[in-house]
Amino acid sequence: MSKRDYYEVLGLSKGASKDEIKKAYRRLAKKYHPDVSKEENAIEKFKEVQEAYEVLSDDQKRAQYDQFGHAGANQGFGGFGGGGDFGGGFGFEDIFSSFFGGGGGRRRDPNAPRQGADLQYQVTLEFEEAIFGKELNVEIPVEDPCDTCKGSGAKPGTSKETCKHCSGSGQVSVEQNTPFGRIVNRQACSHCSGTGQMIKEKCTTCHGSGKVRKRKKINVKIPAGIDNGQQIRVSGKGEAGVNGGPXGDLYVVVHVRSHEFFEREGDHIICEMPLTFAQMALGAEVEVPTVHGKVKLKIPAGTQTGTEFRLKGKGAPNVRGYGQGDQYVVVRVVVPTKLTSHQKDLLREFAGQEEQDDSLFGKLKRAFKGE
């Protein structure tokens, strides 16, 4: 299933301002948050809104998304948050605090489903591998539900008990003296961490956490035409969710090794081709390396050093599937450092014959200097 456009997710046009993006996110996050929404697919919608906001609220990520779409949306994405929240730097409490002045809004249900943490994996590709794409089997460390206790954290054959300190509510009342008098606040129970349940006998495998550290093998398809610094999102391959929530995502960040002959500029490939003075002066047909194999290139007589030739369709494929780049060949004259006596005599004879024509002689000197 293809991903929806991020602007469409937030109900915005492509030219939306940062303030409009933030307002749209706050409205939709409040609407779809699992603690509030009764819609069946609220978790997925909240996750979709969160993902769109994370990209469009960041100038660099937004520019990458506008240029490359979902394939390049997260270029340069930094570290990822922990698995105990829906990630993203603008939480549900922020939404309510903006309406109620902070602290007085509804608290998150600790037993509500929560998305698992996102993971990041760095991979280095050869120049040609990035051009043509490849499949990789990567091994990443993840926290998965404990097989022994099925993720409950309790010893098999036992179950969690209702917390006696909060009577299973997950919250306790705390009185505070303020300049306005004594007030009573509700806060998370410290004994059960707000869950309302206690583990009397912990699982000996996971020690009550309900999770164990494992190494998981994941197949990752690198699309043809991916460039250095771009990343691939593998949905649902991050950390396991909490309380039945969806798993996080895996982000594979691509690094491409430099090539000794080719350079890349977007979908185009650039190279320099050394030629002799005779080839450029008299014309020649030469073989030029490309990532697709060698091709023949005709050099017209009188070609000047620095001249650029275009090999159509010999560049990198567009990572979004929009055609193929070209290869540009820049020719450079190579001045010989060692000459035989015969070669020197021929050059002196040539120089003597053409010395009367200052313009031609000047061109010759500039050609040998590589200007």
From Swiss-Prot:
Entry's Gene Ontology molecular function annotations: ATP binding; heat shock protein binding; unfolded protein binding; zinc ion binding
Q: Which Pfam families match?
A: DnaJ (PF00226), DnaJ_C (PF01556), DnaJ_CXXCXGXG (PF00684)
> Could you say which residues bind Zn(2+) 2 here?
C163, C166, C189, C192
CXXCXGXG motif repeat segments run 146-153, 163-170, 189-196, 203-210
Task: Say if the entry is tagged with keyword Zinc-finger.
Answer: yes
One cellular component (GO) term of this entry: cytoplasm
- Give the GO terms filed under biological process for this record: chaperone cofactor-dependent protein refolding; DNA replication; protein refolding; response to heat
Ranges where the J domain occurs: 5-69
KW Repeat (keyword) present: yes
Required cofactor(s):
Zn(2+)
What protein family does this chain belong to? Answer: Belongs to the DnaJ family.
> What binding partners and quaternary form does the record give?
Homodimer.
Q: What does this protein do?
A: Participates actively in the response to hyperosmotic and heat shock by preventing the aggregation of stress-denatured proteins and by disaggregating proteins, also in an autonomous, DnaK-independent fashion. Unfolded proteins bind initially to DnaJ; upon interaction with the DnaJ-bound protein, DnaK hydrolyzes its bound ATP, resulting in the formation of a stable complex. GrpE releases ADP from DnaK; ATP binding to DnaK triggers the release of the substrate protein, thus completing the reaction cycle.
User: What does UniProt say about this protein's domains?
Assistant: The J domain is necessary and sufficient to stimulate DnaK ATPase activity. Zinc center 1 plays an important role in the autonomous, DnaK-independent chaperone activity of DnaJ. Zinc center 2 is essential for interaction with DnaK and for DnaJ activity.
Name used for this protein in its record: Chaperone protein DnaJ
Source species taxonomy:
Bacteria, Bacillati, Bacillota, Bacilli, Bacillales
